Amino acid sequence: MKLGITEYIDCAHHLPGHTKCGQLHGHTYTIDVVIEGEKKGGMIVDFADLKTAVKNVLNEYDHRSFNEFLDYPSVENICELIGGKLITQLPYSFTIRVWEGHGKYAELNVTK
């Protein structure tokens, strides 16, 4: 069974050498995290516990520039960055989808 949450962070970034996105600008990123697991005691995990684990990772980036963490903060690299941190926080297989504005996203699947 799958269980998911959505969180939001506001961050700036610029893509060095890119004509349009080379200037510093910001986005409200939508982060979807969907875990997969077996129900135990009627649920996979309490939503509050899942939200806490995800927020603990996202709080590091909220209202900051992704250029502090990545040389080239494309949405693909941002997705890998956040997904890599979630690997240590979530004992489940999961999918993370990072939306950069409306209609544009990168997705990473992690199997445990």
Protein language model regions, located:
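Charge-rich, low-complexity N-terminal segments
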Residues: 1-112
